[in-house]
């Protein structure tokens, strides 16, 4: 198990564009395992490689069953070189970020997205997401571009700090 340190706002790597992955090899698969170990330990809904200081284009999405419709097993995705190829609709919802601990704000996002990426075998996949899944995908892909959720907030008055003892409640709404 390799839980990595999640870097926080102020670290310049969070503001840099990640580099495209050319070959899905054992090094990339190990990076994916590290991302999974780290996101699970942090109890987040997603994590991008730049958040652990690695400027590579890979994300994981970890939406547990209790965040989705009853009977749905949840969502676990590893996406390499993800890009949004279609987006529609609009939603505004509370977001937080493991790299900006304790801070939350209302962020506008597309309601529906289609993402093209590679899987861990190097095969092209397309993922369609709506609602929370669409939000998490957009949030994590933003990290690959050096964009943080606070950059997307239209109404700065919604940005607020929620102390640790209240964070669990807020994470039920966000936690990326």
Swiss-Prot record:
Record family assignment: Belongs to the polypeptide deformylase family.
Signal peptide boundaries: none
A Pfam family recorded for this sequence: Pep_deformylase
HAMAP family: Pep_deformylase
Catalytic site: 140
GO MF annotation list: metal ion binding; peptide deformylase activity
Database matches in SUPFAM superfamilies: Peptide deformylase
Cofactor: Fe(2+)
Biological process according to GO: co-translational protein modification; translation
CDD domains associated with the record: Pep_deformylase
InterPro entries named among the record's database cross-references: Peptide_deformylase, Peptide_deformylase_sf
Domain of life: Bacteria
Cofactor note: Binds 1 Fe(2+) ion.
Residues annotated for Fe cation binding in this entry: 97, 139, 143
UniProt-recorded name of the protein: Peptide deformylase
Function: Removes the formyl group from the N-terminal Met of newly synthesized proteins. Requires at least a dipeptide for an efficient rate of reaction. N-terminal L-methionine is a prerequisite for activity but the enzyme has broad specificity at other positions.
Stored PANTHER family: PEPTIDE DEFORMYLASE (PTHR10458:SF22)
Reactions the enzyme catalyzes: N-terminal N-formyl-L-methionyl-[peptide] + H2O = N-terminal L-methionyl-[peptide] + formate
Keywords attached to this entry: Hydrolase, Iron, Metal-binding, Protein biosynthesis
NCBIfam families from the UniProt entry: pept_deformyl, PRK00150.1-3
Keyword Iron: yes
């Amino acid at each position: 198990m390799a839980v990595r340190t999640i870097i926080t706002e102020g670290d310049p790597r969070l503001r840099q564009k990640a580099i495209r992955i050319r070959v899905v090899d054992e090094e990339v698969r190990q990076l994916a395992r590290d991302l999974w170990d780290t996101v699970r330990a942090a109890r987040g809904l997603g994590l991008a490689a730049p958040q652990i200081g690695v400027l590579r284009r890979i994300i994981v999405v970890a939406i547990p069953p209790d965040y989705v419709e009853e009977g749905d097993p949840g969502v676990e995705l590893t996406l390499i070189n993800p890009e949004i190829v279609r987006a529609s609709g609009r939603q505004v919802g509370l977001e937080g970020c493991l790299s900006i601990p304790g801070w939350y704000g209302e962020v506008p996002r597309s309601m529906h997205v289609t993402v093209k990426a590679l899987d861990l075998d190097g095969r092209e996949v397309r993922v369609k997401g709506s609602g929370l899944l669409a939000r998490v995908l957009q949030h994590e892909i933003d990290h690959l571009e050096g964009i943080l959720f606070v950059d997307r907030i239209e109404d700065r008055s919604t940005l607020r700090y929620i102390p640790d003892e209240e964070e669990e409640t807020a994470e039920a709404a966000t936690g990326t």
